[in-house]
Each structure stands twice: as structure tokens, then as C-alpha cells.
Amino acid sequence: NYPAIKKWISHNREYYMTKDYIITKDKYGDWCVPPESLEMIHSQDPARKTDGALIATAYYLKVLQLMHRFASLQGLTADAKEWEDLEHKMKDAFNAHFLHIKEGTSLVPGHTLYPDSVFYGNNTVTANILPLAFGLVPKAHIKEVAKNAVTTIITTNKGHISTGVIGTQWLMRELSRRGHTDVAYLLATNDTYPSWGYMAAQGATTIWELWNGDTANPGMNSGNHVMLLGDLLPWCFNNLAGIRADRWKSGYKHIVFQPAFEIQELSNVDASYMSIYGKITSRWKKTPMHLEWDIELPANTTG
């Protein structure tokens, strides 16, 4: 509903945007991150929680990107320019406010210094994943920001999930997009807390509301709450099976196939998706010496 979203943009700009183009309104933040104690519902550790203004501003920028595209498709030239201009101003403000570049050090006089660490906010996985996923990171810093997200996952969190509802929506596909499908696969197959596999190992047949749903205070602890599934299933179809829609063609009219053959621990995938044109299938298996891949496309589509 383009007119309604337009009103939403105006409302938030009027009431919740600072003169420096930062959105301050946020209620839940990265809801339900794994807490520091198994009995807790919500973490109180500042190191685990992502700045609500970072989340709100990043999502406002994402909406502007979508609205620019929607306006362009409808031929609304003036609107498209308005969204694009505001996006550019907010993107610069976002990086000025949230991007941190810690300079390197050297004892050699005149030595060229490269950034020692580049990250957003307080360097949570969510704080780094959102700018990456929304195209907000300056090109020169993309690899460093992605590296910090991976380092936090592997080193700080020992290969475990640390994101809540917001970060988990983009986590898996963005890791793969940045060349870290192996890290995404580690998260997908981990069966110790906190992880999806841990839920299954404890007998869960649906997704819990909390990563620690088996131990947390029952005051807010649904056993059937799909929100923490995040983008795990889209990642399975888009990246493991490699079934993706061409974003510039409507409804899988053109299909992009690009499976994650590179995952050493994964030897076979069999997936199908019922699109509006019909069934799309990607089925592959491999050995160290052989790869076999079958795909099926519906009539009146290309791939």
C-alpha cells in the first residue's frame, strides 16, 4: 500500500527523526537475543543488545530503498527522487553516527596505517549485519565489517547464534552473500545452546519464542513462535539449493540457480518450490570426485 507507507515515512520523519537524520523511536530492539543467564527472558547485558536507534534508522533506510523502487516502477518520478535524496542524506548520517573505525598502530615513522577494526554500534552481529544487508556500508569497509561479524560469531560466541528477531531475519543469507556460507552452515547445524538445533535436540517440534525456551521463566515463553526462525528456510532454498528469483523479473519468471556446492560437510540437497508458474526443483549430490545436479523449470520461465 504505497500511499500508507508514504504517510508512515512522513509521520516518522516529523516525530522521530533528529536534525541529523537519525530515527530515535524504537520499542523492542533486537527482540529476544540469547540472555546471559538461562533463566532470564531478556538480556540486560549492554554488550549483547544492539542500539535501538541503529536498528530504527537502518530499517527506515531500507523502507526508503523499497519506496524508491516502487515509485520508479509506477513512474512517480518526483517521489522517486525524494526517496533517493533522503536516502543519500540518511546513509551519510548513519555512517557518521554508527560506523566506528579504529586506526591501526605502527612504530615505524611514516608507515601507512590500515584500520585495525571497522564495525557498527557496539559490534554485535546484528549491528554489523543490518548495514551489510541494506547496502549501507561504504565499499572500502565491507570486508572488514563482514569480518567483524564473523569474528564475533566464531570467537566470541563459539559458533553460536547471538541475534534476536531483527538480526536473525538477515543473518544467514548475508553471511553467504559475503562469502561465509561455511559460517552460516555452522550456525544451521549447531545443536548446542543457543541454536535451532538445540531446540530440536530438546524435543521441540516448533520454534520457541526464546532461544532458552526450555529454561526461561514461563511468564513469556511460547513454544510455537516462528519469529526466531529468521531467514533459515529462505537460506536453505536460496543458498543450499540455489533457487532464487531474479529480482528484476516478476514472480520467478526468470530463475537464478546458484547452489552452495562449496560446503565440504554437505553432500546432497533436494529441494523444490511451487512458484506461480509451477514447480521449481534443484537436486544435487557430490563426492570428492563427482558432482551431479538436476534442475527443473516450469513452462514459460527461463533460468
Please report, for each region that a protein language model flagged, where it lies by residue.
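Non-catalytic C-terminal accessory modules of carbohydrate-active enzymes
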Residues: 182-303
